[in-house]
Amino acid sequence: MATAGEESQTQAGRHQEVGHKSLLQSDALYQHILETSVYPREPEPMKELREITAKHPWNIMTTSADEGQFLNMLLKLINAKNTMEIGVFTGYSLLATALALPDDGKILAMDINRENYELGLPVIQKAGVADKIDFREGPALPILDQLIEDGKQGSFDFIFVDADKDNYLNYHKRLIELVKVGGLIGYDNTLWNGSVVAPPDAPLRKYVRYYRDFVLELNKALAADPRIEICMLPVGDGITLCRRIS
């Protein structure tokens, strides 16, 4: 039988690997949050899409339910209308956003895999918010460059990024121009399941260690960027909110 210390080490190790969306060191506490605050108030379309996504072999890529709830409320609080999402997967966070926007709200959504998006599209359509979404398949950087060339600077109220971590800084260089002064950019996975503080010899998977270096670089750059105010939150896998101030 494992000792209390061994069980603690096992749980700590699990939280250093991508595969557990909560950064809380207690699974029971996270379950309490979901069962008392998140699931009872989760819109039916989001519940349906979450359950569909859970069957996907890469379901860990989805936004967690508590983070979806957070994004939905945040968008309402800032009265967002024109938004952008880089990295869609099956569309759980996209649906959370679409449900929060007014009837004339818009989301420019980008992902390299349309097939995953189409898995959730029937739910989005049934929820009556598909007309708010302009989905574009392919790499985001060329689209962002075109937006800047077309003079769309300062036209977005909120931008959510949950995509390739090795391009986060490249995204930021462009998004800081596209978000309005007073608008928000949200970068997901900025605590990378706790691996950002794992010791150098921690037994991390190769891709976890690889992307961790980019996440650490991003966190350092955001903290030093005078054009934004930042707030890093331990929601989901860590989300850093950046409010453009200049």
UniProtKB/Swiss-Prot annotation:
Q: Per the entry, which co-factors are needed?
A: a divalent metal cation
Recorded catalytic activity of this chain's protein:
(E)-caffeoyl-CoA + S-adenosyl-L-methionine = (E)-feruloyl-CoA + S-adenosyl-L-homocysteine + H(+)
* Chain sites annotated for binding a divalent metal cation: D162, D188, N189
One GO MF term, please?
metal ion binding
Instruction: Check the record and name the SUPFAM superfamilies matching this protein.
Output: S-adenosyl-L-methionine-dependent methyltransferases
Report the record's Gene Ontology biological process terms: lignin biosynthetic process; methylation
Cite the binding residues for S-adenosyl-L-methionine. T63, E85, G87, V88, S93, D111, A140, D164
| PROSITE patterns, A to Z | SAM_OMT_I
EC number annotated for this UniProt entry: 2.1.1.104
Pfam families named in the record: Methyltransf_3 (PF01596)
InterPro entries attached to this UniProt entry: Cation-dep_OMT (IPR050362), SAM-dependent_MTases_sf (IPR029063), SAM_O-MeTrfase (IPR002935)
What keywords sit in the KW lines?
Lignin biosynthesis, Metal-binding, Methyltransferase, S-adenosyl-L-methionine, Transferase
What the entry lists under Gene3D superfamilies is as follows: Vaccinia Virus protein VP39
* Family affiliation: Belongs to the class I-like SAM-binding methyltransferase superfamily. Cation-dependent O-methyltransferase family. CCoAMT subfamily.
Biological role stated in the UniProt entry? Methylates caffeoyl-CoA to feruloyl-CoA and 5-hydroxyferuloyl-CoA to sinapoyl-CoA. Plays a role in the synthesis of feruloylated polysaccharides. Involved in the reinforcement of the plant cell wall. Also involved in the responding to wounding or pathogen challenge by the increased formation of cell wall-bound ferulic acid polymers.
Q: What is this protein called?
A: Caffeoyl-CoA O-methyltransferase 1
Give the source lineage, highest ranks first: Eukaryota, Viridiplantae, Streptophyta, Embryophyta, Tracheophyta
What gene codes for this chain? CCOMT
